[in-house]
């Protein structure tokens, strides 16, 4: 499994790719498992990635500083 983590500082959103790259339209459904934490799935139910909104309030600041920033 190839994992990738990105952080968009302007949007304060992080994304953990469990499949990379995710092609346009590949994510067919999502579930918000907790406020601001969303799981993306393909058409077969395979977990593609995790989106974290308001990431700076949820994730460790050090972790965000050590990620690829968009």
Label every model-predicted segment.
Residues 9, 41-42:
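Short, acidic, Ser/Thr-enriched surface-loop or helix-capping motifs
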Residues 22, 54-57:
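A short acidic/small-residue loop/turn micro-motif
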Residues 29-33:
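Short loop/turn motifs at secondary-structure junctions and domain boundaries
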Residues 57-69:
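A short, polar/charged loop-to-alpha-helix boundary motif
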């Amino acid at each position: 499994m190839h994992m990738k983590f990105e952080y968009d500082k302007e949007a304060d959103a992080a994304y953990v790719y469990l499949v990379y790259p995710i092609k346009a339209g590949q994510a067919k459904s999502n579930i918000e498992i907790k406020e601001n934490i969303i799981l993306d799935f393909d058409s077969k139910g395979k977990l593609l990635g995790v989106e974290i909104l308001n990431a700076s309030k949820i994730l460790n600041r050090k972790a965000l500083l050590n990620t690829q920033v968009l």
